[in-house]
Amino acid sequence: MRRRYSMDINRAIRVAVDTGNVVLGTKQAIKNIKHGEGKLVIIAGNCAKDVKEDIFYYTKLSETPVYTHQVTSIELGAICGKPFPVSALLVLEPGNSAILNINNE
């Protein structure tokens, strides 16, 4: 059950990257959150503690939901179809994805 749930999240992330508007990277995610943009932040499980604290601080101020995915940044990059690690991503528009429902499950 846990594996299937993880696969659904991975698929939703990939669809959001392919069909929606997603910002990759911690610096760009924090920058957009500070401007009140974004609907959901997804953080890799191995994201640096200080970066994670910054993201949680700014998302609390902007009331943006955060989901900590239990994959590494390298795996999150692969899920996004990128050849580099992704520690955080910010969903601006979900596209055809049901990514915004993951916090409710």
UniProtKB/Swiss-Prot annotation:
Gene Ontology terms, MF aspect: RNA binding; structural constituent of ribosome
Keyword set includes ATP-binding: no
Coiled coil: none
Annotated InterPro entries: Ribosomal_eL30, Ribosomal_eL30-like, Ribosomal_eL30-like_sf, Ribosomal_eL30_CS, Ribosomal_eL8/eL30/eS12/Gad45
GO biological process: translation
Gene3D superfamilies: 3.30.1330.30
UniProt protein name: Large ribosomal subunit protein eL30
Primary gene name: rpl30e
